[in-house]
Each structure stands twice: as C-alpha cells, then as structure tokens.
Amino acid sequence: MVLGCPGESRISPERIAGYTAAMKKYGVPLVEKPEEMIGKVDAMLIEAVDGSVHYERAKPFLEAGLPCFVDKPFACSVVDARKMIDLAAKKNVSIFSSSALRYATEVTQYFADRKHGKVLGCLTYGPASTHDRNPGLFHYGIHAVEILYTFMGPGCERVSCVHDEGADVATGHWKDGRVATVRGNRSGPSAFGFTAFAEKGIHTTAVSSRFFYRELLKKVVEMFKTGKPPLDPSVTLEIVAFIEAANRSGANHGSPEAVKA
C-alpha cells in the first residue's frame, strides 16, 4: 500500500480517525480526495463498507484504467453492479469483489478434497446484522450468500425469503433443479458454517475466521499482478441480483422473486 484516502463514511464514521492514525503510523501517505491518487498508484482497493457508494467511488479509477478490488457488498443494486462491470470491460481493466468467506479454509478444503462429487444442494449460515445503507442481506448476510454461491455456482432463477427480527432465510432455485438455502442470523450464535449435499455424501462444518481475509488478499494481489480476476464478475453480479430478489421477497411475505442479473 503506497497511498490512501480516509474519505467519509455514513455507516462507521467513528472508525475513520483510528484507521487514519494507523495508516500514518505505518508510513502510508494520505490525500484529501481519492482522485488525487490517480497517476500515483497502479491499482485501487475500494474499502467503503457502504455498498451504495461503491460505483461512484470506483468510477474515476476505472475510467483511468486502474484495476479495482471492491470490497463487499460489491453494490446494493444490480444497476450499480452492472455499471461497474460494464465500465471495467469498456476500459479493459480487471475488477473483482468477494466476501473473504469464499476463501475460508473449510470451504477451499472441501473442493480440494475432490471426493464429494457434484454439489446437489447446500445450506449456509452466518450472522446478518442489517443497516439502512446496505439493506437486508447486503450488509453482513452477504458473507453466507458468498459461501452459498461458492458451492452452487451461478444459475439461480428465483428466490423466496422469510424475514423476521431474528433472521432472514432465503431459498434459491437453480436452473438445473438444485435448491439451496442461506440463513442469516440476528439472534443466537454468530458463527459461519455450511452443509453441502453432494453425490457422494453430506458434509457439515463450521467455518473459522482465522485465515480467510489473508487468503482473500492473496487473490487481490494475484489479480493486480496478472490482470485476471479470480472470480468472473458475472458471478458477483448474480450474487447482487440474488440478494436484491431475497430482499424483495422478504418484504413481500416470502413471495417468489426472479433473480434478474
């Protein structure tokens, strides 16, 4: 990291001072406006917790031809997500977004084992606190949704979601007939985990938080070096569409909603 900008936050403004002090402690120069970094950096990390501002934050850097990692949630609408992806394609630069849970040890080890066969369905869970700036599952529930998509891949057609004060429970139906469910908890334990239903067995495990952010950063650095994102942006776009559909369903008493990416 060679340059940074504290910026502003409408979700966690109280954290800016601490992060600014930490950057200064480690000798990272800071600028007042993000655009001042253009011409002085090779790539950008958009780290605002507020997904609704990611397009406006990423836009000047994508237009300048800089590859971008956009932290979760990539966007809080399909419209904004598509704008970023289309702009990156137009400028021929890489763009990448993911929850670190995609790279948790228990998740990657499942696929490294190569003994389970095709995933037929999945149940994932995790904490799902909410914030008006990141509605519904966009705020913290996106972590469990990312695990779900790591197992199921893209292709979800519709979602039904039951929403109450304690949880969001969203069930997706895939084009090939598979079904998967994500549970975002706002009461009880705040653990992450999954149950994968595969051709050769059922595997259930909790997911540790010890190493996943380190593993995500390895993927970010790899993209900046190679220019190739580790995850196709179309998958990220569908994750945004899945959450949009789940939020609509939850607000409409669980009615099925189409996933429109």
Kindly label every feature range from the protein language model.
Residues R57, M84, Y110, A245-A246:
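Aromatic/hydrophobic pocket-lining residues that form π-stacking "cages" and hydrophobic walls in ligand
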Residues M1-A64, D86-K91, N252, V259:
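N-terminal glycine-/serine-/threonine-rich beta1-alpha1-beta2 phosphate-ribose binding loop
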Residues F69, F74-N134:
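A contiguous active-site-proximal alpha/beta segment in oxidoreductase catalytic domains
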Residues G188-K228:
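Interdomain hinge/lid region at the active-site interface
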Residues C122-S190, S234-A241:
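Rossmann-like dinucleotide-binding domain that binds NAD(P)(H)
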Residues E36, V41-A48, M223-A261:
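C-terminal helix-rich "cap/oligomerization" subdomain common to oxidoreductases
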Residues E32, V70, S97-S99, S160-H163:
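Short loop/edge segments at beta-strand edges and connector loops
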Residues I16, V107, A144-V145, Y213, ...:
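A general structural signal for well-ordered alpha-helical segments in protein cores
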